[in-house]
């Protein structure tokens, strides 16, 4: 069968989210003023709002949520419950999981598993120790960006030291992720398609053979099984 995993963005909202619009209209008197991180009413935002706020990774179009606020958690958990009961989803892929707080992930984990015992939680983690997120009580899996880089660059450079080092570091006898079910990939919606990254298309088959034989959870980005090409550029990522 097919499992449905929803891409969930709980770290931030856009500026057109109803909560942000209410703060724009009501300022200090908004009942939502504590929903975001570092809201201050003694200055202006770069967009001229009569308050300042924290943008995710410095991007002021993405307003960082205060996920440890009880009302924010209730709103998020209510949405998740609706997805489970009405659409029977099987899991969540947490966007920007590496900047969500541990306490939030633990509460989310407990809530989801109270609704569906075989629920699956995985997170987008780019930097840091994957064991901080992929562990009992938090997430079932996280993205393995370290191995991703090692796989394609080793083939392009025809020097397999990098991927050998990563595999041994992660999964060898003393591997730091030996028991962590990491989510392995060759491309996704945030990086260039592997068919455009490799210098020679003959590398694709051995790359996928490696993907499916290393420890962890293998994944194929839609269309990549056909060798679809695509690169990000200064105008966007529509090719991906």
PLM segments and residue spans:
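Catalytic grooves of carbohydrate-active enzymes
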Residues: 84, 188-190
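Loop/turn elements at helix/coil->beta-strand transitions in domains of secreted/extracellular proteins
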Residues: 2-5, 88-91, 116-120, 180, ...
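Short loop/turn motifs at secondary-structure junctions
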Residues: 87-88, 185
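Substrate-binding/active-site clefts of carbohydrate-active enzymes
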Residues: 1-81, 86, 108-114, 131
């Amino acid at each position: 069968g097919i499992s449905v995993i929803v891409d969930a963005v709980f770290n931030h909202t856009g500026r057109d989210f109803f909560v942000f619009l209410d703060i724009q209209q009501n300022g200090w008197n908004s009942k939502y003023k504590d929903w975001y991180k570092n809201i201050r009413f003694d200055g202006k935002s770069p967009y001229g709002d009569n308050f300042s706020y924290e943008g995710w990774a410095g991007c002021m179009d993405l307003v960082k949520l205060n996920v440890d606020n009880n009302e924010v958690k209730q709103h998020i958990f209510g949405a998740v419950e609706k997805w489970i009961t009405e659409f029977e989803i099987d899991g969540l892929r947490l966007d920007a999981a590496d900047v969500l707080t541990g306490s939030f992930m633990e509460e989310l984990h407990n809530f989801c598993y109270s609704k569906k015992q075989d629920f699956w939680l995985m997170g987008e983690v780019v930097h840091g120790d994957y064991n901080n997120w992929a562990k009992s009580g938090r997430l079932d899996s996280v993205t393995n960006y370290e191995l991703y880089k090692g796989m394609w660059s080793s083939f392009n450079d025809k020097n397999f030291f990098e991927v050998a080092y990563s595999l041994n570091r992660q999964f060898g006898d003393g591997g730091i992720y030996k028991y962590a079910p990491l989510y392995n990939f060759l491309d996704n919606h945030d990086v260039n398609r592997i068919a455009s990254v490799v210098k020679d298309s003959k590398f694709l088959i051995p790359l996928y053979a490696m993907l499916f034989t290393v420890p962890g959870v293998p994944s194929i980005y839609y269309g990549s099984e056909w060798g679809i090409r695509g690169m990000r550029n200064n105008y966007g990522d529509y090719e991906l």
